């Protein structure tokens, strides 16, 4: 990846986001070639961080996440843990969810999805991290 200028530029773009390191950027580039080409709903479903409902008739089931690309979910989990503490945008988002009574794991998965959507938009628009526009 370091030898190819296109991949190197994409990795630097992804790493411009706070708390997104080399491992996260490399995994996203290698495992998700669709990054920057899909909308936020489709990229979230592809990775497996979009909630799916289990409704039938009048029964309203739980919303769960499943499927997707396990390696990407693993690195997003670690990046979201770090971003939850150090990224002001993700921290404010998580605090809002916790204030509404959401559980810690639910909040963390929502942070994973938020981080993925931000990174997808950054790649799509070819812009570096800007906390005001994120």
What are these regions (language model features)?
Residues 1-134:
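A detector of single, family-specific signature residues
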């Amino acid at each position: 990846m370091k030898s190819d200028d296109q991949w190197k530029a994409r990795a630097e773009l992804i790493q411009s986001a706070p708390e997104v390191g080399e491992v996260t950027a490399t995994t996203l580039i290698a495992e998700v070639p669709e990054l920057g080409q899909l909308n936020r709903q489709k990229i979230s479903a592809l990775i497996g961080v979009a909630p799916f409902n289990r409704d039938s008739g009048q029964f309203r089931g739980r919303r769960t996440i499943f499927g997707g690309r396990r390696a990407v979910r693993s690195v997003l989990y670690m990046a979201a843990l770090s971003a939850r503490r150090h990224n002001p945008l993700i921290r404010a988002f998580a605090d809002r969810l916790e204030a509404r009574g959401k559980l810690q794991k639910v909040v963390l998965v929502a942070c994973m999805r938020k981080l993925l959507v931000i990174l997808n938009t950054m790649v799509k628009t070819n812009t570096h991290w800007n906390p005001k526009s994120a």
